[in-house]
A protein has these predicted regions:
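DNA major-groove recognition helix of helix-turn-helix/homeodomain DNA-binding modules
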Residues: 49-64
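Conserved hydrophobic/aromatic packing and binding residues within compact polymer-binding modules
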Residues: 11, 25-26, 36-39, 65
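Short basic helix-loop element that most often maps to the first helix and adjoining turn
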Residues: 9-28, 53, 79-86
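Recognition helix of helix-turn-helix/homeodomain-like DNA-binding domains
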Residues: 30-45
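A detector for short, charged/polar N-terminal pre-domain segments
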Residues: 1-6, 76-77
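Short, charged recognition helix plus adjacent turn
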Residues: 66-86
Length: 86
């Protein structure tokens, strides 16, 4: 699973747990409604300011949205994200 897919999955889970539609989350986070869908569909990753807005709007922590993402150390060109072991 890619970083985008894992983050999108985490965002969708937190949004559903908060009982919000994508549009409601977008309004609360002051971001465009299509941005939420694009993030959930793994078409883009949020900037750090958007991450902060999303956590505030969801009442979630950044840890929840980043859950399952791990960095595998290495040369800056060779390091990569990997799926966390279950």
């Amino acid at each position: 699973m890619t970083v985008e897919e894992q983050f999108g999955r985490n965002l969708a889970y937190c949004r559903r747990r908060a009982k919000l539609s994508q549009e409601e989350l977008a309004v609360r986070a002051s971001i465009h409604r299509t941005a939420v869908g694009m993030i959930e569909r793994a078409e883009r990753l949020p900037r750090i300011d958007t991450l902060v807005k999303l956590t505030g709007a969801l009442g979630a922590s950044a840890d929840e949205l980043l859950d399952g993402l791990e960095w595998e150390p290495g040369d800056i060109r060779l390091g990569r994200f990997r799926e966390a072991a279950s």
